Amino acid sequence: MYLKAYHIYFVGIGGIGMSGIAELLLNLGYTVSGSDIRQSDITDRLTGLGGKIFYGHDGKNIGGADVVVVSSAIAADNPEVAAAREAGIPVIPRAEMLAEILRLKYSIVIAGAHGKTSTTSMVASVLGQGGMDPTVVIGGKLKSIGTNAVLGHGDYIVAEADESDGSFLKFSPSIAVVTNIDREHLDFYPDLAAISKSFLEFLDRIPFYGVAVVCLDNEPLQALVPLIKKRFITYGTSNQADLQARHITPINGKVRFSVVWRQEELGTIDLGVPGFHNVRNALAAVAVGLELGLAFAVIKEALETMAGVQRRLEKKGETGGVIVVDDYGHHPTEIKATLQGVRQHWEDRRVVVVFQPHRYSRTKALFDDFTRAFYQCDELVVLPIYAAGEHPIDGVDGESVAEGIRAHGHKGVRYVEGRAEAVAYLKEILQKGDILLTLGAGDVWRIGEDVLSGQER
């Protein structure tokens, strides 16, 4: 990058997406500072790497910065953003900074409504196993290294794209993976057609020598296939896909499947992370590995031994015979897939879910879908909505979600007002042998930790 932009300031530096970029820039030798509303293990890590972190937002904090980076979660009237504009300091979205980093290497970008983080981690594992030493920027912490960013010395960078505000159109990846398209981020996109159009534009940005890797099992994505202008590889369970998973079978807490590449069976994989939905994510990583010339044996080893990502069907611990699991899923499609994965991984156990809806806008737009997403759990505890900076919407709250789920026939639904009430209620109902699953993109994971520690807050 042009070194006249040497000091980079991040507003909301503790976010999982922002912190990864900040860590890469620190490792590249840039001066990095930023602010967040609270201290966390993420901000502590950045401080340890040489970053300067402020807690709370104040226009004085940006002093000396050459550029200010913001995420879509930062309000336009944020005092640091206002101070930067008044001082003539460029204010750019997170995606624009990531796009600059991607220009340094051959980029492999993973996009899609669901499964991005898991797929990105799998692609990174495959390249790492193949000796390619990739740089990685991911939307979750890799369990193997405890961070969401790695500065490698190889020629490739693997990154997760955020389509929520259309900013992924700033990328021109050498390899673009699209896992699926769904009704998501309807606070930005008017409808599914607009979302599909945006993904097609993303694929159009692939250079002439690049390739698209797309899932043929997803109907909206399948509809785009005839419109893709660049070379592409399809994957999925469909017999029409270039790369197929066949004979999918749960075995010893894993998922075994056969991999078929253009009618040639390459072998089997015992996937190291649970859930049938992860088979498709793994196929995307297989496709990328094959495209880069890696042997199937190398790809197989990577996918069978990978540790996974924090907050993706993550087993947190066990207490009193209750296994506590946490997952980031917050969209109805993700919730259904996660519950299916839990049922497959822990057969014949009672599943107790604590769900924290995320954002008022998402809850309103997908309300009917949420009411039908929890049939595979035995007991459901619903929390108030995690606002994520949004203002409340009349008639949209956690209690209405619980009532809607109950109205659709679920007999084990309970609404609670907060963390302490949730933990107290769980103490009453949990039984030896249960699976306790915390679900949501907010701070619902804290409830699982409270249960494990025996604390009520």
Swiss-Prot record:
ATP binds at G112, A113, H114, G115, K116, T117, S118. One of its GO terms (molecular function) is ATP binding. It catalyses: UDP-N-acetyl-alpha-D-muramate + L-alanine + ATP = UDP-N-acetyl-alpha-D-muramoyl-L-alanine + ADP + phosphate + H(+). It is found in: Cytoplasm. Pathway: Cell wall biogenesis; peptidoglycan biosynthesis. Gene3D superfamilies: Mur ligase, C-terminal domain, Mur-like, catalytic domain, NAD(P)-binding Rossmann-like Domain. The keyword Nucleotide-binding applies. Its EC number is 6.3.2.8. One of its GO terms (biological process) is cell division. InterPro entries: Mur-like_cat_sf, Mur_ligase_C, Mur_ligase_C_dom_sf, Mur_ligase_cen, Mur_ligase_N, MurCDEF_pg_biosynth, UDP-N-AcMur_Ala_ligase_MurC. Keywords: ATP-binding, Cell cycle, Cell division, Cell shape, Cell wall biogenesis/degradation, Cytoplasm, Ligase, Nucleotide-binding, Peptidoglycan synthesis. Its main location: cytoplasm. One of its GO terms (cellular component) is cytoplasm. Cell wall formation. Belongs to the MurCDEF family. This is UDP-N-acetylmuramate--L-alanine ligase. It comes from Desulfosudis oleivorans (strain DSM 6200 / JCM 39069 / Hxd3). The lineage of its organism: Bacteria, Pseudomonadati, Thermodesulfobacteriota, Desulfobacteria, Desulfobacterales.
